[in-house]
Regions:
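Rhodanese-like catalytic fold shared by cysteine-dependent sulfurtransferases
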Residues: 1-10, 31-60, 73-133
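N-terminal capping/interface segment
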Residues: 1-4, 15, 20
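Short hydrophobic beta-strand that contains or immediately precedes a catalytic carboxylate
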Residues: 13, 20-25, 38
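A general structural motif
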Residues: 18-19, 59-61
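Gly/Ser/Thr-rich loops at beta-strand to alpha-helix junctions
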Residues: 67-71
Length: 133
């Protein structure tokens, strides 16, 4: 990571007032599990125009995350270029979230242990939870 987008830890995230949480993983990853109240914006199919329409206040606090923080940094950088002023990258992504016993939910908003690990290489970073490929 180049750290263009400042990190926010899990504890810091929990103290934020009404953050907009954006999941920058692919839809199939989001469908397996995601952090509650997150909105899927994708990575390969990220659509800046639709994000701007949905979140028009450039002063809103936005927290982006992915598996470990690489893709979310890329999307966070795009958001900054669109004019968003308060963009943060969730440190360690959904893997760090799950490794710290934080809940993730499936598409039915049911708590699940499943986490899409993106690849075998990245799967080593998920210590807790059930790895899904």
């Amino acid at each position: 990571n180049k750290e263009n987008i400042p990190y926010v830890t899990i504890e810091e995230f929990k103290k934020l007032k009404h953050p907009i949480l954006l999941d920058t993983r692919e839809e199939k990853e989001f469908d397996i599990s995601h952090i509650q109240n997150a909105y899927s914006v994708g990575y390969d199919n990220f659509n800046a125009k639709s994000v701007k329409q949905k979140y028009s206040n450039l002063n809103d606090t936005i927290v982006v995350y992915c598996s470990v923080g690489i893709r979310s940094e890329t999307i966070g950088t795009k958001l900054k270029k669109l004019g968003y002023k308060n963009v943060y990258n969730l440190y360690g992504g959904i893997f760090e979230w799950k490794n710290n016993n934080q809940p993730v939910v499936d598409n039915n908003q049911e708590i699940t242990d499943n986490v899409h690990v993106f690849s075998k290489e990245w799967s080593e970073y998920l210590i807790k939870g059930k790895k899904v490929y």
